[in-house]
Amino acid sequence: MGVEELERKILEDAEKEAEEILEEAKRDAERIREKAEREAEEVRREILDRARREAETRRRREIAQAKLEIRQERLRVKEEYIEKAIERAEEKIRELAEEGRKEYLEFLKRSAIEAVNAISSDEVVLRANENDLMLLDEMLSEIRDETGKDVELGEPVEAVGGVIAESKDGSEAYDNTVDARLRRRRSEIVRRVSETLFGG
């Protein structure tokens, strides 16, 4: 083999090797590009998933907060109307009492008899506000006759209306004032207000 042939052979081999290196580099570059795209897609999906999860969490939190606020507002409104209902009832009773209306006199007598009968003792003391004590004084004999008990009047108390019955020895008491009756009926008032405002 001559010198020229040897040179050509060397050049051909070098070119061939260079082409192979170039092809390998291209393949490596393609693999790197594909890997980078895959990783970029994974990162993109992860970011979107995280954003969706955070948005859903935030949405649920906002819904829960809104529901809580609605519930609190309903309770506030309900409580406000319950208080108004009780205040109106008390005011109505005050008006009836001040006017000396027949309805109130009947209510007071019934309250007194009910309270006296709730005491097991035969000697009972009735207490009420000053105005009601004067009214009770006029109906005391009727209360005694209807209950068959020795009933007397005691010291005045702070109350919208109605009576408190106590055994003479102080061992028993039954609060039948308007305030106490309204407290006992509070659950019924709450139910009625709830039905009126919220349908149940």
UniProtKB/Swiss-Prot annotation:
Organism: Methanopyrus kandleri (strain AV19 / DSM 6324 / JCM 9639 / NBRC 100938)
Top-rank lineage group of the source organism: Archaea
Protein's cellular compartments: Cell membrane
NCBIfam families listed in its UniProt record: PRK03963.1 (NF003049)
A single MF term (Gene Ontology): proton-transporting ATP synthase activity, rotational mechanism
UniProt KW Methyltransferase keyword: no
One Pfam family, short name: vATP-synt_E
SUPFAM superfamilies (UniProt xref): F1F0 ATP synthase subunit B, membrane domain, V-type ATPase subunit E-like
Chief place where the protein resides: membrane
Purpose of the protein: Component of the A-type ATP synthase that produces ATP from ADP in the presence of a proton gradient across the membrane.
Name by which UniProt lists this protein: A-type ATP synthase subunit E
Cited InterPro entries: ATP_synth_B-like_membr_sf, ATPase_E_C, ATPase_V1_Esu
GO cellular component, one term: proton-transporting two-sector ATPase complex, catalytic domain
Gene Ontology terms describing biological process: proton motive force-driven plasma membrane ATP synthesis
Stated family: Belongs to the V-ATPase E subunit family.
Topology term for the membrane: Peripheral membrane protein
Quaternary structure note: Has multiple subunits with at least A(3), B(3), C, D, E, F, H, I and proteolipid K(x).
Keyword annotations from UniProtKB, A to Z: ATP synthesis, Cell membrane, Hydrogen ion transport, Ion transport, Membrane, Transport
